[in-house]
């Protein structure tokens, strides 16, 4: 199956508007979905390698903490229950060594994990008990980023019609601003969070420029490329660049599969767009893939989001199948 495609095709940047490009990419995505297991095996093998290395250094707390941290990061977008196990290990190591920096890093990472799985109250409780002034400079960005993750997920969960959504958006603006200020220009995340800030301020053209700068630092097939491509898709949608929006969602979905990122959003949004265009078969296939990922990751609030869309697409898909079967019987 397809492992490599032309670099000019597989890049979320401005290209000539042509629907054939999107169709070619959709065929690649179809193939990737068929071979999700291959990428899952790669992911599992990489994690297993880290676990074996961690066992070799189980008596060295410094190395163990570092390796456990890497394992949590691998599990963070892949399988939340396993991420909690190694997060607990590092909390124990940090407390045993009375190491405040290790403990802060662990708490911030755990807060992100909690909000990603829909445990918003528990995530906020951790962050509210941290004094940002006590944090060392390198962790200031992580602190603001963790709050950004919390309010971003709360905003997604509540939906645009919720009276709380505006509150979450205002909080997001504050933490976007604080997050990018904690970084220096040239840091890739500086441009990503500056782009987020531009979006909240409705400066969509500037947001596009900054997310493009971030995307240049990422590589296809990685979680960061998936995130950047999704953010660009959101911006393209607001700017009315519909074909580019769809294209960037495809890039993002492909990178999610190749990096075995199960906590994702692109496939769900892509399914909705294709459904609106009347491409019921693909929409059904993509929303089922999205639901499968959410169930695997155990993302409660992502399941709720998908459940609002999946039955509508499924009903139309089944109606189409029934109509086709009737036509075959009478032909």
Language model features with spans:
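A "functional boundary" signal
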Residues: 1-326
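Selective detector of the "anchor" transmembrane alpha-helix that sits immediately C-terminal
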Residues: 330-331
């Amino acid at each position: 199956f397809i492992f490599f495609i032309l670099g000019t095709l597989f890049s979320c940047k401005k290209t000539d508007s042509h629907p054939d490009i999107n169709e070619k990419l959709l065929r690649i995505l179809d193939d990737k979905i068929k071979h999700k297991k291959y990428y899952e095996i790669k992911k599992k093998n990489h994690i297993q390698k880290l676990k074996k290395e961690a066992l070799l250094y189980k008596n060295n707390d410094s190395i163990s903490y570092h390796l456990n941290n890497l394992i949590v990061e691998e599990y963070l977008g892949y399988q939340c229950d396993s991420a909690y196990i190694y997060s607990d290990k590092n909390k124990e190591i940090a407390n045993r060594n009375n190491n405040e920096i290790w403990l802060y890093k662990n708490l911030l990472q755990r807060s992100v994990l909690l909000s990603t799985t829909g445990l918003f109250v528990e995530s906020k409780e951790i962050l509210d008990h941290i004094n940002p002034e006590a944090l060392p400079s390198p962790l200031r960005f992580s602190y603001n980023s963790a709050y950004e993750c919390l309010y971003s997920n709360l905003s997604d969960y509540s939906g645009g019609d919720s009276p709380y959504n505006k509150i979450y958006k205002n909080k997001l603006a504050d933490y976007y601003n604080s997050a990018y200020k904690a970084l220096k220009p040239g840091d890739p995340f500086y441009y990503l969070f500056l782009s987020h800030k531009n979006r909240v301020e409705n400066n969509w053209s500037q947001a596009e420029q900054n997310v493009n700068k971030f995307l240049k630092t990422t590589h296809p097939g990685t979680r960061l490329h998936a995130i950047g491509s999704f953010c660009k898709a959101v911006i393209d949608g607001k700017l009315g660049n519909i074909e580019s929006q769809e294209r960037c969602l495809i890039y993002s979905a492909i990178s999610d599969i190749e990096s075995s990122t199960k906590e994702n959003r692109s496939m769900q949004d892509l399914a909705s767009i294709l459904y609106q265009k009347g491409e019921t078969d693909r929409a059904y296939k993509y929303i089922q893939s999205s639901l499968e990922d959410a169930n695997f990751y155990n993302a409660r609030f992502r399941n709720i989001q998908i459940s609002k869309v999946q039955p509508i697409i499924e009903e139309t898909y089944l109606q189409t199948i029934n109509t086709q079967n009737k036509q075959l019987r009478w032909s």
